[in-house]
């Protein structure tokens, strides 16, 4: 993927271990520190070495403002080795024979809120997915807390919520 620029942001692939370390640092800030979890937790996992890491940087300060990773699965390659498969039964998704990719660890720096960050990130994702011929994109997401009512609108968009009849 060629770097993608919009306004003051650039999205590009990580090219070396230092880039991946920067992504891991932002992930730690977003998923551990910002949520007041144990600072000793690392956000690195065994999947990182098998993924493309995409960085979105502010061109004025070189600050890493967003990152995510993609793990590609070629045609007929089972997705049972994906991050998501650790937590969910993906057997029905495995029936899809085309190229697949798992989107993971998507985060935006907690101190940055410019919508162009998301636009550049999704633009880069689209470029990569289209360029690789990916037919099916999947992944996990994290929600703060355990109260699903806070996220009812988001859940309804991907999985219709049926109301139970009053007894």
Task: Provide a role label for each language-model segment.
Residues 67-73:
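Active-site ExK catalytic segment of metal-dependent nucleases
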Residues 73-167:
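Acyl-donor binding region in acyl/amide transferases
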Residues 51, 66-67, 107, 140:
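Generic recognition of cysteine residues
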Residues 1-66:
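Short amphipathic alpha-helix that is part of the acyltransferase structural core
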